[in-house]
Regions:
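Membrane-interface junctions at transmembrane-helix termini in multi-pass inner-membrane proteins
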Residues: 132-154, 168, 339-366
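Interhelical loop/hinge segments that connect adjacent transmembrane helices in multipass membrane
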Residues: 1-7, 150-154, 177-178, 183-184, ...
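Signature of the first transmembrane helix
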Residues: 6-63, 221-244, 396-398
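Interfacial transmembrane-helix starts/ends
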Residues: 8, 45, 78-94, 217-220, ...
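Transmembrane helical elements of multi-pass membrane transporters/channels
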Residues: 10-25, 158-159, 163, 180-195, ...
Length: 436
């Protein structure tokens, strides 16, 4: 059977969706910096936003595994259209979301001090958001697994636009911080109208997976361990950074804003194309490292060019959009942060390859190593900017090295010959029951 590839129009739709998402995220950050006080902006930008999207990042393991499971099921049986498990993938995702929400509520006394304003409501909003996002991630993953790329793009751009519109509504209604926080989480409801009012959405909702519900859940939980590491480096980093620094000045707020604006141009499109990447790697398992090399070189090239632009014109643009923090984002800092975003992106691509090869343990190992090093380096006695640059450069390089070494040692590496005697990096093969 010939493998379906993503067409130019589908790629354009996904790219356009990622541009909308990046632009909406940037716009929300600028709006928050303008309308919120320094203390409110610090809570929103360095506590609520990174924590929410850090937890969303962990929950995003549902999307990755659903893409693999649905895509693998279609490769095995192209006519497959309905699941054969007692629980659908979306029901399993919802249950996992409820479990994460329960953990959020139970652990909130340990971290809710980061929200001096509306602490209880902030916890409730996060718990609600994670349940809705779990289902959103499952539907998005299933659409990628089925190669329903226009629907996939609509989900991504729709969520971002709803978040932006809700933020503007909060400004017009003078809801301030609580309104901004509410706007962040309500966007995850986008999956509901997309499934109810779209034929494609309905078919995606009833997609089948290649393993049992129990194995599907186990795979997701394992991926969540590594997704926690990914969240530390990508979305939740400012939350952990504020716990290791006593800096309450505007410089810290400027650094957090700079991390966001230098990351979005690379990471937002990459996150939008993760489903495409996993789907493509699934279809090129005979030469996995060759399939990985090209996108990595592209990402690093874009990162280098972006770093040059950030150095030359970044401070000027930053001062325009973040006028409250003018003069606090030098060009060298913006350039380093931009290129380090490309390094993180390379780690994300390597992780996607590990998932496509069904090497979940290796995926976990890479991200856990990166996260552990990041948390360790956060305590190095340097100024906050130097410490941030050290963490965001060294940690993803460590994780990428672990994953690359694991693939080379596995029988799924380029040579096709295994040098891994321990079996550490190989998942157990699915049983007949797990494929039912």
């Amino acid at each position: 059977m010939a493998h379906k590839t993503v067409t130019a129009y589908q790629s354009a739709a996904i790219f356009f969706s990622s541009v909308i998402a990046a632009a909406a995220t940037f716009a929300i950050s600028v709006i928050a910096a303008y309308f919120l006080s320094h203390s409110e902006f610090r809570q929103f930008q360095s506590a609520f936003w990174p924590l929410v999207f850090g937890i969303y990042g962990i929950t995003g393991a549902i999307q990755q595994e659903t893409t693999r499971a649905v895509g693998a099921a279609l490769l095995q049986n192209p006519e497959s259209r309905t699941h054969t498990n007692s629980l659908s993938y979306s029901a399993v995702a919802a249950l996992l979301g409820l479990g994460i929400a329960a953990i959020v509520v139970m652990t909130s006394p340990l971290w809710s001090s980061a929200f001096p304003t509306y602490p209880q409501m902030s916890v409730v909003l996060i718990a609600f958001g994670v349940v809705m996002y779990a289902v959103y991630a499952a539907v998005s993953g299933a659409s990628a697994g089925r190669d329903s790329w226009y629907f996939y793009a609509a989900l991504g751009s729709g969520e971002a636009l709803i978040r932006l519109v809700a933020t503007l509504a909060a400004v017009m209604l003078s809801w301030h911080l609580l309104g901004f926080e509410t706007a962040v989480v309500v966007a995850s409801l986008i999956w509901l109208p997309c499934v109810v009012f779209s034929r494609t959405g309905w078919r995606v909702w009833h997609a089948s997976i290649d393993v049992s519900s129990r194995q599907y859940a186990r795979n997701i939980v394992m991926l969540m361990l590594s997704s926690a590491g990914a969240s530390i480096l990508m979305t939740a980093f400012p939350f952990f950074l504020q716990f290791t620094t006593q800096d309450q000045s505007a410089q810290f707020n400027a650094l957090v804003a700079a991390i966001g604006v230098t990351r979005s141009p690379i990471m937002m499109p990459l996150q939008a194309f993760q489903g495409v990447a996993i789907s493509a790697f699934l279809k090129h398992q005979d030469y996995p490292l060759r399939a990985l090399a090209r996108p990595c070189l592209w990402v690093l090239g874009i990162g280098g060019f972006g770093a040059l632009l950030a150095y030359l014109i970044g401070p000027f643009l930053f001062d325009i959009f973040y006028s409250k923090y003018a003069g606090l984002a030098p060009g060298m800092m913006l350039a380093v942060l931009t290129f380090e975003s490309a390094i993180i992106a390379v780690l994300v691509l390597a992780g996607n390859l590990a998932i496509a090869l069904n090497m979940h343990r290796l995926y976990v190992s890479g991200w856990v190593c990166a996260a552990a090093l990041a948390l360790l380096l956060l305590h190095v006695p340097l100024d906050v900017v130097s410490r941030t640059e050290l963490v965001l450069g060294a940690a993803p390089l460590c994780g990428f090295t672990v994953i690359l070494a694991g693939i080379l040692r596995s029988p799924k590496g380029e040579s096709g010959k295994s040098t891994d005697k321990s079996g550490l990096f190989q998942d157990a093969p699915a049983t007949r029951h797990e494929k039912s």
